[in-house]
Structure formats: C-alpha cells, structure tokens
C-alpha cells in the first residue's frame, strides 16, 4: 500500500536559509509512518477499543536504522507529500521506503528499518499478520 502524508513546512522547522533543518527530515518521516500505521490499523484499533494505542492490538515497533538521501531542499511554506510503502518484510523487522515530494518533484528518499516488538517485554517479536495485511493493501 502506498500512503501519502502531507504537511506544510513551518518557519520554526527551517534554518537561516529558509530550508528545512536536516534533523527535521527524520521527524517528518517518522511522523508519516506513525500516521500511516494508525490509519491502516484504524479498524483493528477500534475493535480493541482504542484509536491510537497499538498495544491494544498486541503490537509495537521501534526504529532500528534510518537512511535519508537528500536531492533538493524543502523550503518554508512548501507542502511536502511523503509517499510511504513497505519495501521489505522480514520475520520481526520491516523496511519502509518514503519518497518526499514538493509539487511532484522528488526532494528526498528515506528507508527506515523497524523492528516489531512485544509491547510488554519490548523484545523482538514476529510481525502480526494483521499489521502485514494492513500495510500491504
């Protein structure tokens, strides 16, 4: 499934050149994946009596690695569209590829590796099928 998360770049997220400060790209992609996950799992979360708590469905995930390749700047006032999709499924880890675009022009590519963890022990655990299904639609 490809999910698009959009945001407008605010002044406080930029440096003196009025371009996004480099660390904020990582905040943006993490937020995009969080929004996508909760959107894709919204029916399962509702059945479990929650709208946001992934623990209610027996799932949580933590970042292992992030890689970002910058192509051109994202600037103050731009609307940034982040196209997210799972690019690799493992047993307990998965990769999410994100392409950041402004007006259809690619500004960066990121790949994040996440590890599925048991919410109680926070130890790696197999990715639940409901998560794989939801993020693969």
Tell me the role of every PLM-derived stretch.
Residues 1-81, 87-137:
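Terminal targeting signals and extreme-terminal segments of soluble enzymes
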